[in-house]
A protein has these predicted regions:
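A nucleotide- and high-energy phosphate-metabolite-utilizing enzyme signature
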Residues: 1-491
Length: 491
């Protein structure tokens, strides 16, 4: 660390500690005691300098900060069920929706403080950080869903359906799409959701039955409000419902049958692309398996899909054109050589080969990339460069977002936030960070250019496309057709 940044951090932490004690005099002695502990002062300095959001949580809710320290939570790797268990404990005795929303937001602030503390101090790697944010989102959805289901069932009865001759209670399932489905949420992600339920029917146990679709629509609205709405206590996660069938004009909730019919009859290639990461984040295991099994044939096809190849080529062109049109050079996600291009490379192979190569039916980008090397879909050196770039870019994204809890992937332009970002990522100055960033983005751009090559860009690719068309039209002799299929990973 350079002398300039060291002095900046030292000056900042002295001022921040004084401000904390002034605003929270009842915690002043406690903080002084903690500062005597090994590593605490250094970790506090890194956290408060690297994340003004984390510092504000400590200022405004010192009881949450103290509880984490007393529990030694900053030193602990949480088990998968820890987030749900901690939140469930905090919701005990709550029977009012307003109190639920306050508790959800309080829990979010506390858990994000822990996650950012561990991230900036490199007590957690990228996989743990994204997993923890995703599990926090899952727990919030599950607990809010269960609360509102109980509340609405008390008013309108329990939704049921006739299944194998038996009236059976029905539940609403929540599909987590995108990064939530893949346990890859960043520090300030929105969450893409789709709601569905197994069978049509109506409620029972109330004076006037209600159609299941209406019941679950009301439930969905309550859930979104509890998670998404900005209040005096903040929000939990921004909710995006645009990936559902028919988009913003579609029903908020669909039955399994209606979902299956939509994707079979009207599902588009970009929806296949989106469905790769889909995962049930709330709902019973039995119904979760059922809906995923219904959607799998739409996502992964066991034959060569020529239209998908062309759609992916168009998508690739759109990605590059959008980056140029919007001037996204400083965007580590959407700009050239950014996170989206790495995700596109992985998902291209999944859509084209995933139906035949089960190892590619994986939600997490890093696992897909490793599978591509193992299956000789990409050279090992290319995969290694992409993996290194992915970790670097995602860590950069987190450093940007942790600063003020803002959903941004744009590199800062001013000196102070630049010095904070470089410090968060362990660089002595912005210049060293920028050089490393350029190296990774250059590597990603090079590999992105080689995927689904435009015919005009490569005579070899043009020749291969011509051979595929001849195969499609039945113009190749059987031995030649067989060799073409085998050479390109198809039996």
């Amino acid at each position: 660390m350079t002398a300039d940044i060291s002095q900046q951090v030292f000056s900042d932490i002295q001022h921040s500690i004084a401000a904390f004690k002034e605003r929270n005099s009842g915690y002043a002695e406690w903080l002084d005691q903690q500062l005597q502990q090994a590593d605490f002062g250094e970790q506090l300095s890194r956290t408060w300098f690297g994340s003004h959001y984390a510092k504000e949580v400590c200022y405004r809710q010192p009881e949450l900060f103290k509880a984490l320290v007393d529990e030694r939570a900053f030193t602990l790797l949480y088990a998968d069920n820890a987030f749900s268990g901690r939140l469930s404990h905090g919701l005990q005795g709550i029977d009012d929706a307003g109190q639920l929303d306050i508790a959800l937001r309080k829990n979010r602030a506390q858990e994000m403080l822990r996650i950012i503390w561990r991230d900036v101090n490199r007590l957690a790697g990228l996989d743990e950080t994204t997993r923890d944010v995703s599990l926090l989102a899952e727990a919030s959805i599950q607990q809010a869903l269960a609360f509102h289901y109980r509340q609405l069932s008390g008013l309108y009865g329990t939704p049921t359906a006739l299944v194998d001759g038996v009236q059976t209670p029905q539940e609403m399932l929540v599909l987590g799409m995108g990064k939530l489905g893949a346990w890859e949420l960043n520090l300030s992600s929105d969450i893409d959701l789709i709601f569905c339920y197994p069978h049509s029917g109506e409620t029972c146990g109330a004076d006037k039955p209600m159609d299941n679709g209406e019941f679950f629509t009301r439930l969905a609205r309550k859930l979104i409000q509890s998670i998404d709405q900005m209040t005096a206590d903040g929000f939990v996660f921004r909710v995006d419902m645009r990936l559902r069938p028919y988009g913003e004009s579609g029903a908020l909730v669909l039955s399994f049958g209606a979902m299956e019919e939509y994707y079979q009859d009207q599902g588009r290639d970009w929806e296949r692309y989106a469905m790769i990461k889909a995962r049930v984040v709330a709902g019973s295991a039995e119904h979760a398996r059922h809906i995923i099994d219904l959607l799998r044939p739409f996502t992964y096809r066991r034959y060569i899909d020529f239209s998908a190849i062309e759609s992916l080529r168009s998508m690739k062109q759109m990605i590059r054109k959008e980056a140029k049109r919007r001037g996204l050079d400083n965007d580590v996600k959407l700009g050239a050589g950014g996170i989206r291009e790495i995700e596109f490379i992985a998902q291209c192979f999944q859509l084209i080969r995933g139906g035949r190569e089960i190892q590619l039916q994986e939600r997490r980008v890093q696992k897909v990339l490793r599978a591509l090397a193992e299956n000789n879909c990409l050279p090992a050196i290319a995969v290694d460069e992409l993996l290194q770039a992915y970790v670097f870019l995602r860590n950069t994204e987190h450093a940007i977002q942790a600063f003020r809890d803002q959903q941004s992937q744009m590199l800062p332009g001013d000196d102070y936030p630049r010095s904070v970002l470089a410090f968060y990522l362990g660089f002595d100055d912005w210049g060293l960070f920028s050089t490393e960033l350029d190296r990774h983005r250059h590597n990603v751009s090079r590999h992105f250019a080689d995927v689904i090559t435009d015919p005009e860009e490569s005579s070899e690719a043009q020749e291969l496309d011509s051979r595929w068309r001849e195969l499609w039209l039945g113009e190749l002799e059987p031995p030649v057709a067989l060799a073409l299929l085998q050479d390109n990973g198809h039996e």
